[in-house]
Amino acid sequence: QALDDIISRCEIDILSAPFDDPTDDARHYQIGSYTDCWGSTWVNHQAGIIGEVKEYPFADFNKVWNYESPKKLFLSGISGFEKTKAFIDTHKDKFILGGWISLFERMQYLRGTENLFMDTLIESPEYFKLMEIVEDFYNTYLDEWLKLEVDGIIFGDDWGSQRSLLISPETWRKQYKPLYKRFFDKVHTAGKFVFMHSDGYILELYDDLIEIGVDAIN
């Protein structure tokens, strides 16, 4: 109660801008099964959470070569940013965060978590093609957000378990650090800040994240 009292006396300074994203399926939070626009089939047994992916479009990795991401679907919904712009205009006294970019987690949804962990060690051409597909989509996604008067962009990937990273620090630095840096550089070039969320124990990555430009981490 004491904490609630303190919070009630303080104004919220940071807000997340809304966006009616056509690639973000509302069925995420409903009980049942469905296939999203990426081709991942979700199963949810409890309303209010997003469930789990049970069927992956790249369970057969050969399919990666003829895959088309939902980039066109995303671009078809750019008009949804009108509500975003109106929100920004009415909250100019606040720090506004935009977007939500999940690179590693999207790769898991497409390939399967266990498969992806093995892929980081095998380093097949299909694995790097998967990474390329995800990077290409989110580059387009980021470009549209950077056209708006937001103050920062959010990146969210859970990299830790309770005790350690999900993959070795060396593998992360080799494969994912350059990937994130390309995105973070683009955000900073646009004069905006990089916010990053990751659950789990990620202490071993802090120096790397600072080096490549994370401004705030949760």
Map each language-model feature to its residues.
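Active-site-proximal helix-loop elements at catalytic-domain edges
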Residues: I7, E55-V64
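Catalytic domains of carbohydrate-active enzymes, especially glycoside hydrolases
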Residues: A2-F19, E144-V150
